Structure formats: structure tokens, C-alpha cells
Regions:
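Hydrophobic transmembrane alpha-helices and their immediate loop junctions
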Residues: 1-151
Length: 151
């Protein structure tokens, strides 16, 4: 049921770190640009994965296919238009994942259509970046608290 594939795990680590880091960074960047400086004050306005990755959540993703990152804390009362801005901050993470997924997809497409010589490891990592980002975007838009789609 919970198959464990060591090769998939190794190829997936960069994809998961990229997906989680950019997802949470997008929330932080959106919040700050909309007037809430809480993420900046908490050190979350960075692409340093250590600010965004919860080690236990990352391990759980591999072991049971369900995990988490450190959520970006925001204070909606700091927003200019709290209801609208809260939604925009929530959508920023999945939107970033979709963008990264499309970029990875087009890199894969370019490699395949132009017969670019890349190692199987590099190709596998790019594939996992695509898979994890698209899955994160879809999953996070489910209307279930605390996911982004519940806002």
C-alpha cells in the first residue's frame, strides 16, 4: 500500500524541496506585497529551504505519501483588503507550484524534442519537479482546512 522506492526517494528530494520552498516563499512574498510584514519579521521571505521545510513533514511525505511544510504565518488585519488579500496569499502558493510545474514540463518537452543529452538522473529529477509541483498545486486547492483552498 505504501510502497517505498529508494531511487524515487533520491530523485524526489530536490523536487520536494523546490516545491515546498517556492510554495511557502510565494505565500510570504504575496503577504508582504499586500501589506503584512509578518513573514518578513519571521524570516520567511527567503528561498532558503531551512526556513520552510519541516524535516518530519518531509520524511512523512516519503514514508506515507502525506507530509507538510512550515506554514507561513500571516496577520490578515494588516492587509489593505483583508478578505481579498487573504485569498490572494492563499492562491500564491499553488500558483507558484503550477508555474514551476509548467517550467519543468517545458524543459522535459525541450529535452525530448531536441534530443538533448542529459543524464537519466537529471531527467528523473526534472520529472519529479514536474510531478510534485503539479500535485502540490492540485492538493493544496482542496477546500479542506488548513489547505490553501479552504480560504
Amino acid at each position: 500500500m505504501f510502497g517505498f522506492n529508494f531511487e524515487e526517494m533520491l530523485l524526489g528530494i530536490p523536487g520536494l524541496i523546490i516545491a515546498m520552498t517556492f510554495h511557502e516563499y510565494a505565500h510570504a512574498r504575496a503577504a508582504v506585497s499586500l501589506g503584512d510584514f509578518t513573514p518578513r519579521l519571521m524570516g520567511r521571505l527567503t528561498l532558503d529551504p531551512r526556513a520552510h521545510i519541516d524535516p518530519i513533514g518531509l520524511i512523512m511525505l516519503f514514508l506515507v505519501r502525506f507530509g507538510w511544510a512550515k506554514p507561513v504565518m500571516v496577520n490578515p488585519s494588516n492587509f489593505r483588503q483583508p478578505k481579498r488579500d487573504d485569498i490572494l496569499v492563499s492562491v500564491a502558493g499553488p500558483a507558484m507550484n503550477l508555474l514551476l510545474g509548467f517550467i519543468a514540463f517545458y524543459i522535459i518537452l525541450f529535452i525530448r524534442t531536441h534530443n538533448v543529452d542529459v543524464s537519466s538522473i537529471t531527467y528523473g529529477i526534472i520529472q519529479m519537479i514536474f510531478v510534485y509541483n503539479v500535485n502540490f498545486a492540485i492538493f493544496n486547492m482542496l477546500p479542506i482546512p488548513p489547505l490553501d483552498g479552504s480560504h
